Amino acid sequence: MLDIGGPIRVTDYGGQGPLILLVHGLGGSTENWDVAGPLLTGSGRVCAVDLIGFGESTPGERGPSVEENGLLVADVIDAIGYDNATLIGNSMGGLVSMITAVEHASRVDRLVLVDPALPVSRRHPPDFEVLTKLIGPLVPGIGVPAFRVYRAAHSPEEETAETLRMVTANSETVPEWARDRLTDANRRRRRHGWAIPSFLEADRSIARYVLRPRRFSRLIHKISAPTLLVHGSEDRLVSVDSARWAAEQRPDWTYEEMEGVGHVPMLEAAEWFVDLVTDWLEATT
């Protein structure tokens, strides 16, 4: 644990050389990187962080908004003992990493965005199940009770299975041991009274970006670090149309589309994902 305005959990997967910091998405934790993290250690020292209000990182002096977590990522790089890092962020973690890259540019050497939170596609908006899970809780007075009712009716194992079904194109490709770790993390999360309010606050902070395309466009145009954008063609949470829009906004970025893969390539197709990342890291060294 690091002490950065409160306890912050960092998982160190090992490796030597420049720092590669992995940043999870909404409702996730460092366990989201347990498959891909060790595979990346040939490219540097690989660590993953539990963002504020997620995993085992208790909210303290700071809250769980994407802005606060953008600052946290910069502070974690410093606390681990590096001047800068390559950030690899998935979903909300991609947005957090973009904010770090803009607000603390000297701390970000390179940026890898993995199915990051992006403006909602008008042609292919999220389906009903996704809207219910991500937008429904934002309705005043609904969020906390809805979470409690859901968890009362679903075991940690059932919640993990349902989540993986939603965020992958084929959940069977997620290793059983990784599924077990995600379930254990889910079980621990249920014991934290701050977990649901943190999820809701973070979700609201994401909405302030993804529902405002012009604001998002201004953000990505301020990023100066070399950037790789990786996106699954079958992502139900963030349409591949949104990724193509981002790639058009920044033609200088490298864009890789993973055919037949969902929202979490690092879990669903880890070896393919790592090959894409390591090849790009070598090409941009």
Question: Where are the regions that the model predicts?
Answer:
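Conserved alpha/beta-hydrolase catalytic His-Asp/Glu region
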Residues: 149-221
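Flexible "cap/lid" loop of the alpha/beta hydrolase fold
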Residues: 111-149
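Conserved HGGG/HGGXW glycine-rich cap/lid loop of the alpha/beta-hydrolase fold
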Residues: 12-58, 267
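Short beta-strand/loop motif that positions the catalytic acidic residue
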Residues: 223, 229-231
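Acidic catalytic loop of the alpha/beta-hydrolase fold
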Residues: 209-210, 234-238
